[in-house]
Amino acid sequence: MSSPVISPETKTGKKILLAAPRGYCAGVDRAVETVERALEEYGAPIYVRKEIVHNRYVVDTLAEKGAIFVNEASEAPEGANMVFSAHGVSPMVHEEAAAKNIKAIDAACPLVTKVHKEVQRFDKQGFHILFIGHEGHEEVEGTMGHSVEKTHLVDGVAGIATLPEFLNDEPNLIWLSQTTLSVDETMEIVRELKVKFPQLQDPPSDDICYATQNRQVAVKAIAERCELMIVVGSRNSSNSVRLVEVAKQNGADNAYLVDYAREIDPAWFEGVETIGISSGASVPEILVQGVIERLAEFGYDDVEEVTSAAEKIVFALPRVLRHKN
């Protein structure tokens, strides 16, 4: 993560608070590097199932280098080289790829893979799993595909009412969650679930990933000091959307999600002295720097980085690419 250029003095009274940590997490870094390394090693095209990460800039940049993004493995030609996205896939997707002799490289975040293994383990132990997540998200689809019969989606507190009645009498009941949710919202859902299902068990460890939690804590640390929060991230990025919600819930008067600096509306600045900036876990730092430069045009030329945690986690590349270093 490159450091922001910090002006030596406040010239206008207008200020930027820059949340840290922000941007790329270890899982995203690994996934993007997997596609880049595959392109170097095998040449273009490299097919990628779904968006490798939920960021428009990253996807467009990789496409320019020779990645071809498809919705399903079946759309790639026989024997193609394919990377599965950071969000993880179900066993059925692996089977579809194998049926076409596709050489698949799984770039699933290891923390998502951990949840897959938990689902498999609890299924074998006879548990029904209440999976807290957002319907239609690739991570949710991939995870639930590891236990189709015994995993039940809970999409928000409202989703509790849609759960099947037989679960009321199910003694072996446990909850798990998508890795990119709001920590506070997830705990609220768990509390409501335990009202309806007193027998509900907690998992051995929290599934919400370290990067998601750290970025939410970093936003909380500055939100109360900001009239406006700008989160850099794509609208299909669950963790980026959650950062906007966290900012609003913790003191920011307004919060907006932007992919690029050009999307910023100067009307947002009316009456605003302090602007907070953060970015989702799939956002490269170059996009944050673009926002800082854009705000400087409007007099926000004093930048203070507020650090709430240090991140040193690095994930190894998929095994097939490790010897290519």
Curated annotation (Swiss-Prot):
NCBIfam families registered for this protein in UniProt: ispH_lytB, PRK01045.1-2, PRK01045.1-3, PRK01045.1-4
Record InterPro entries: LytB/IspH (IPR003451)
Keyword Lipoprotein included in the entry's annotation: no
Enzyme Commission number(s): 1.17.7.4
Binding positions for (2E)-4-hydroxy-3-methylbut-2-enyl diphosphate per the UniProt entry: H54, H87, H137, T179, S237, S238, N239, S282
Residues noted as binding [4Fe-4S] cluster in the record, renumbered to the chain: C25, C109, C209
Name of this chain's protein: 4-hydroxy-3-methylbut-2-enyl diphosphate reductase
Primary role: Catalyzes the conversion of 1-hydroxy-2-methyl-2-(E)-butenyl 4-diphosphate (HMBPP) into a mixture of isopentenyl diphosphate (IPP) and dimethylallyl diphosphate (DMAPP). Acts in the terminal step of the DOXP/MEP pathway for isoprenoid precursor biosynthesis.
Catalytic activity: isopentenyl diphosphate + 2 oxidized [2Fe-2S]-[ferredoxin] + H2O = (2E)-4-hydroxy-3-methylbut-2-enyl diphosphate + 2 reduced [2Fe-2S]-[ferredoxin] + 2 H(+); dimethylallyl diphosphate + 2 oxidized [2Fe-2S]-[ferredoxin] + H2O = (2E)-4-hydroxy-3-methylbut-2-enyl diphosphate + 2 reduced [2Fe-2S]-[ferredoxin] + 2 H(+)
Amino acids binding dimethylallyl diphosphate: H54, H87, H137, S237, S238, N239, S282
Keywords for the protein's UniProt record, in alphabetical order: 4Fe-4S, Iron, Iron-sulfur, Isoprene biosynthesis, Metal-binding, Oxidoreductase
Active site: E139 (proton donor)
GO biological process: dimethylallyl diphosphate biosynthetic process; isopentenyl diphosphate biosynthetic process, methylerythritol 4-phosphate pathway; terpenoid biosynthetic process
UniProt remark on cofactor binding: Binds 1 [4Fe-4S] cluster per subunit.
Lineage, broadest ranks: Bacteria, Bacillati, Actinomycetota, Actinomycetes, Mycobacteriales
Cofactor(s) required for function per UniProt: [4Fe-4S] cluster
Family: Belongs to the IspH family.
Pfam families attached to this UniProt entry: LYTB (PF02401)
GO molecular function: 4 iron, 4 sulfur cluster binding; 4-hydroxy-3-methylbut-2-enyl diphosphate reductase activity; metal ion binding
UniProt pathway: Isoprenoid biosynthesis; dimethylallyl diphosphate biosynthesis; dimethylallyl diphosphate from (2E)-4-hydroxy-3-methylbutenyl diphosphate: step 1/1; Isoprenoid biosynthesis; isopentenyl diphosphate biosynthesis via DXP pathway; isopentenyl diphosphate from 1-deoxy-D-xylulose 5-phosphate: step 6/6
Enzyme class: oxidoreductase
